[in-house]
């Protein structure tokens, strides 16, 4: 797939981050594991795509595995490669749920308040270190789904 030469205004490009064994049709399916469908990719490193490449980015139960020290840089990169008017859909286990605590590879807990930092470009002080989001997503909708284990989010880029 060629991601450099395309008309940003016409062509839809979709990215599935952390596809695992569940690639999505019509998406570029990437994963850090050997199961990667289309491309091996470590999202904690700079992403190999030009600015505003994708109209839609999807990540299902991936972002809770991002190390804390990489959290803001990963979202900064997602924001960078998402086109204006594009959407980011993701779901993560709710902090404190059994789903969060039963997997020892979960490193980043999420709550509704976590999204404030992504949506409003806020800063977070933790253990004397200030982490900041120098970008802001637009909150499109946070569906009210009666699932006490998982949080679902849709963010946009204006």
Language model features with spans:
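Class I SAM-dependent methyltransferase "Motif I" SAM/SAH-binding loop
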Residues: 15-21
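Conserved beta-strand signature within the Rossmann-like core of class I S-adenosyl-L-methionine
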Residues: 85-93
């Amino acid at each position: 797939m060629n991601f450099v030469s395309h008309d940003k205004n016409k062509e839809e490009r979709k990215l599935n981050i952390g596809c695992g064994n569940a690639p999505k049709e019509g998406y570029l399916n990437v994963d850090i594991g050997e199961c990667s469908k289309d491309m091996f990719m470590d999202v904690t490193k700079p992403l190999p795509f030009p600015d505003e490449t994708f109209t839609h980015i999807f990540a299902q139960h991936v972002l809770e595995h991002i190390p804390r020290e990489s959290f803001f840089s990963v979202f900064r990169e997602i924001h960078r490669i998402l086109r204006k008017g594009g959407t980011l859909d993701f779901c993560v286990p709710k902090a404190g749920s059994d789903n969060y605590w039963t997997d020892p590879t979960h490193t980043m807990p999420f709550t509704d308040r976590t999204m404030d930092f992504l949506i409003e470009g806020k800063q977070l002080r933790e253990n004397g270190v200030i982490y900041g989001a120098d970008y802001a997503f637009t909150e499109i909708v946070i569906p009210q789904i009666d699932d006490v284990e998982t949080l679902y989010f849709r963010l946009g880029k204006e």
